[in-house]
Curated annotation (Swiss-Prot):
Subunit structure: F-type ATPases have 2 components, F(1) - the catalytic core - and F(0) - the membrane proton channel. F(1) has five subunits: alpha(3), beta(3), gamma(1), delta(1), epsilon(1). F(0) has four main subunits: a(1), b(1), b'(1) and c(10-14). The alpha and beta chains form an alternating ring which encloses part of the gamma chain. F(1) is attached to F(0) by a central stalk formed by the gamma and epsilon chains, while a peripheral stalk is formed by the delta, b and b' chains.
Name of this chain's protein: ATP synthase subunit b
Pfam families per record: ATP-synt_B
Lineage: superkingdom: Bacteria
InterPro entries to which the protein is assigned, alphabetical: ATP_synth_b/b'su_bac/chlpt (IPR002146)
CDD domains per the UniProt record, alphabetical: ATP-synt_Fo_b (cd06503)
Source taxonomy: Bacteria, Bacillati, Cyanobacteriota, Cyanophyceae, Synechococcales
Transmembrane residue ranges: 12-34
Location within or outside the cell: Cellular thylakoid membrane
Family: Belongs to the ATPase B chain family.
Length: 171
């Protein structure tokens, strides 16, 4: 050990003692790494490379599926928008048809009510007219009877009554 201190104090020197410098140990380790490391690391690297390639392939497959799904979703969206537009147009047309039908029924109902009111008015006018005719006839008969009773004698009255009964019987 003193020798190494002496060399260190005297300058740069090489220690050629193989066992002290661990050159053999380093050579064994280097040879072991050279011999076994490529198989071990190579296998690990190959497995890692395969895993990465498989992950990339899976990612590409998922991307392709996602792209296809997106394309299909866009087609479905387009189809749904067309259907929604058609439904909207159909609903507007149906609403317009219902509105026109409702207006038509309202006009018809108003005409029917107006006609019914006119018919009721005509019936009432006919009833009142008939009643007025009966009243006028009754008054005329009463007036005629009152004037005739003073002008007719019993024989003429008897003849007039028989003729009136005959006229009533003909009706």
């Amino acid at each position: 050990m003193n020798d190494s201190l002496i060399f260190a104090t005297e300058g740069f020197a090489l220690n050629l003692n193989l066992f002290e410098t661990n050159v053999i140990n380093l050579a064994v380790v280097a040879f072991g790494l050279y011999k076994f490391l490529p198989n071990f690391l190579g296998g690990m690297l190959e497995r890692r490379r395969s895993a990465i390639l498989q992950d990339l392939k899976d990612a590409e497959d998922r991307l392709a599926k996602a792209s296809e799904s997106l394309k299909q979703a866009k087609l479905d969206l387009s189809s749904a928008e067309q259907k929604a537009g058609k439904i909207r147009t159909d609903c507007q047309a149906r609403a317009e048809a219902i509105r026109l039908e409702s207006e038509k029924r309202t006009v018809e109902e108003m005409a029917r009510i107006k006609q019914g009111a006119a018919s009721d008015l005509n019936v009432e006018a006919a009833r009142v007219s008939g009643q007025l005719r009966r009243e006028a006839a009754k008054l005329a008969i009463e007036k005629a009877l009152s004037t005739l009773s003073g002008k007719l004698d019993d024989k003429a009255q008897d003849k007039f009554l028989k003729q009136s009964i005959k006229n009533i019987g003909d009706i």
